[in-house]
Amino acid sequence: MGKRVLIVDDAAFMRMMLKDIITKAGYEVAGEATNGREAVEKYKELKPDIVTMDITMPEMNGIDAIKEIMKIDPNAKIIVCSAMGQQAMVIEAIKAGAKDFIVKPFQPSRVVEALNKVSK
């Protein structure tokens, strides 16, 4: 049984692409969320091993969602996948508790590398 991943992104095609990469890498998709608030709810409900988190989303952004998830589980393994690759945003995500930061558009191998790194 592979590790379970919660995919969080407001773009359906991005969730689909991540789902494909994640399952091909031998991980299981525990669920999907389309915004930060939903991500926090799904995290509580599904208790995934890993979360992929977008930053720019409606209702609650990824940084706030990371902070909320870290309150629930200080050991949460969150990988940020965002087009916002500015240094300040990366630092803010890591400070909030993210374990890795992947800049979109990304290569599937980069996602697999991040999954393998955080699941150790």
Curated annotation (Swiss-Prot):
One of its GO terms (cellular component) is cytoplasm. GO terms for biological process: archaeal or bacterial-type flagellum-dependent cell motility; chemotaxis; phosphorelay signal transduction system. The modification 4-aspartylphosphate is found at D54. It comes from the Bacteria. Coiled coil: none annotated. Mg(2+) binds at D9, D10, D54, T56. Its cofactor is Mg(2+). PROSITE patterns: RESPONSE_REGULATORY (PS50110). It is found in: Cytoplasm. The keyword Phosphoprotein applies. The keyword DNA damage does not apply. SUPFAM superfamilies: CheY-like. Phosphorylated by CheA. GO terms for molecular function: metal ion binding. Binds 1 Mg(2+) ion per subunit. Signal peptide: none annotated. InterPro entries: CheY-like_superfamily, Sig_transdc_resp-reg_receiver, ST_Response_Regulator. Keywords: Chemotaxis, Cytoplasm, Flagellar rotation, Magnesium, Metal-binding, Phosphoprotein, Two-component regulatory system. Involved in the transmission of sensory signals from the chemoreceptors to the flagellar motors. CheY seems to regulate the clockwise (CW) rotation. This is Chemotaxis protein CheY. The gene is cheY.
